[in-house]
């Protein structure tokens, strides 16, 4: 056993004995245990290389699952990092966990950038990156996350593949077109630099040799001629046929994680006679006057199941800015509408999103949000 392996063993034993990396994390139920990684590093380092897939959202887990299906027989380690944990996150994490060789859920309820969370978590990620066997490919969607760079910088020779993260990949104002990671505070910035070296958003973007997109026919910010673009259909409605829509109409509002949207969402629901709201996976508040669809499924999977059960029902989906409008617009018996409050100024921050909806032929309905 070489000196490097001895040092890694000692460091891991210190971590396990004193619980340094678990001080602020008591709800992960062993999903961050590194014993298996240490065992591989010490005794099976020459085995078949692994592919890493990093996810931050349920949509990203759905894409990751499809990517894994295209590479049967290969080893995949999945890393989910999230500030949220609920029924939906657990359902889709367990789905992908069953298909991966290993899966890790980093639940960060206070966010990575909190001072007490940043340094121990980044240190944990760096240690675990060094415990991995040989890495062949790294897949990611959230280019702006410094946490992923802890792994990218450890394996600079690994192939980098990127994939879509909703509408972030379709608007020119996307954070994925940035240069450096946004880390607040000099101490945290200096520590991040120790963990990731000169890695940056731009370096990650430029290193990507292939990008998977779930949006067909829409201009992607990663489609700049530097890499292969691969279309990856995410939700399969090909076996469903449009019915005659004589079974009534179900109107559903897509929720938002932003609490500031509560009042305006309630007004929209009343204005358009919307009966249901599909809460966003990160939404923590309810809406009065509408019924919440409490389901472990994301809205696309939920609607596909409903169409199978009720092929003659008309489904109307209303949204302010959800990318699910784009993934559902071609479902049979589904009609998608974007909502625009009349009070929004001409230079409002959602303007690029509404331009995208127009490009996708999604009707935009303006309503009076002041009465």
UniProtKB/Swiss-Prot annotation:
Q: Which pathway is it part of?
A: Bacterial outer membrane biogenesis; lipooligosaccharide biosynthesis
According to its UniProt record, which residues of this chain constitute the active site?
A: 258 (proton acceptor), 280 (proton donor)
- Tell me the protein's name: N-acetyllactosaminide alpha-2,3-sialyltransferase
Q: What is a biological process (GO) this protein takes part in?
A: lipopolysaccharide biosynthetic process
Stored Pfam families: Glyco_transf_52
Q: Which UniProt keywords apply?
A: Cell outer membrane, Glycosyltransferase, Lipopolysaccharide biosynthesis, Membrane, Transferase, Virulence
Task: Quote the cellular component terms of the Gene Ontology held in the record.
Answer: cell outer membrane
Judging by the UniProt lineage, the source's domain of life is Bacteria
Localisation per UniProt entry: Cell outer membrane
Q: How does it sit in the membrane?
A: Peripheral membrane protein
Tell me where the transmembrane regions lie. none
Q: Which reaction does it catalyse?
A: a beta-D-galactosyl-(1->4)-N-acetyl-beta-D-glucosaminyl derivative + CMP-N-acetyl-beta-neuraminate = an N-acetyl-alpha-neuraminyl-(2->3)-beta-D-galactosyl-(1->4)-N-acetyl-beta-D-glucosaminyl derivative + CMP + H(+)
* GO MF term set: N-acetyllactosaminide alpha-2,3-sialyltransferase activity
- Name the family the entry cites: Belongs to the glycosyltransferase 52 family.
- Corresponding gene? lst
Listed Gene3D superfamilies: 3.30.370.20
Protein purpose = Catalyzes the transfer of sialic acid from the substrate CMP-N-acetylneuraminate to the terminal galactose residue of the lacto-N-neotetraose branch of surface lipooligosaccharide (LOS), forming an alpha-2,3-sialyl linkage. Thus, functions in the sialylation of LOS, which plays a role in the evasion of the host immune response by protecting N.gonorrhoeae from complement-mediated serum killing and from phagocytic killing by neutrophils, and which is critical for establishing infection.
Q: What is its EC number?
A: 2.4.3.6
Outcome of gene disruption: Cells lacking this gene do not express sialyltransferase activity onto LOS.
Q: Describe the subunit structure.
A: Homodimer.
Identify the residues that bind CMP-N-acetyl-beta-neuraminate: 255, 278-282, 299-300, 322-323
